[in-house]
Each structure stands twice: as structure tokens, then as C-alpha cells.
């Protein structure tokens, strides 16, 4: 199955992982301008005294930076960017954050810790795609049933909300029924590992630590 449109714009089949605290607009722009998806957690854009709309400031900087580059390089466009949302009920910022991301037409939405159809619907209203973090086959099926477009298989060795399953087992189980966009996360740091992820059945690789 062909990749969804935003993911077809990559020069290298990699997504820069949304690194808590670390990922920021400068890193995202550097990643996108070099042909991979740059991403950041929405919660990294922390509201400061006198500046309550930091997420909007970040999205403005990223969007304008990519637009400026693309205007100068129409034959060599930048890769798209993604914003990671913690969709668990404990995230009191979620509703405000998704409204801001919709306003700025974020092209790729990465969701974690819960499958929320209402978040997927907002993303789709602005022609965005949703990739959902999963640690096993049960949650993978649940995410697709609730409207996610693709999956991030978080296997053993991944950072953040890490899984425990072997990437061989996890990718194989998901590919038995799912033909859509599938990403693999977990101890991937070089081209050989990216190629191995694709050989297993993943479309794209998630890389985080290499960008620290």
C-alpha cells in the first residue's frame, strides 16, 4: 500500500522522534530541511510567564521556516513536520493544543497513551494524518478501529513510552492484518538499522537518540 501523501515527501525513510524536553523548532527545521520528518511533543512548548501561547509561537516559526525554504527550492521541498500529543485524560492542555495545531494545519499528528477518535477527527478536518504509538497488537488494532491512519510500533529498546516486544514479533504481528503506514521505533540509529526495519516490514524508522 502506498504511503499517505505527507510521508511520500521524504528523502530518507526516517522520522525524527519527538524527544521530551529536547525537541524544539530549530531541531525540527533542521530535520525537515534534510529530508526527514521532524517532530516535537506539544508539551515541550511550555507556557511561560507573559507568554501563554508558546505552542503557537513554535508552530509559526516552523511553518514560516518551511514555507520560506520551499519558496526558494520548489524542486527540492522540505519534508513535513509532526506534533506529538499525549491524549491521556490527564493531559489538561490537550483540547487547547489540538485547536492550535488545527489552526496551523499541522500535517502529521502523532498520538500517544490512548486512542481518541475526536483527536483523529480534528486532524482529518485539516487534512492531517494520525500516527499512533502502540506497544502490542491489541493496541494497534484498537488505534486503527478508532480512526488512526498509521502506527508507530514501539518495540524493545525504544525510549519514552517504551515497549517490551521484539521488533521482529511486533512488526510481523501487525503486518498480518494492517497494510497501512507502519513505523518502527527501538534502538535504530544508522542506515543499516533503517534498512533492517524496512526488511522486516516497516515503512519508516523512528530515530531519537542520534539527534541528542
Which role does the model predict for each range below?
Residues 1-181:
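Active-site entrance/lid segments in N-terminal catalytic domains of soluble metabolic enzymes
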Residues 166-212:
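Catalytic alpha/beta core domains of metabolic enzymes, predominantly
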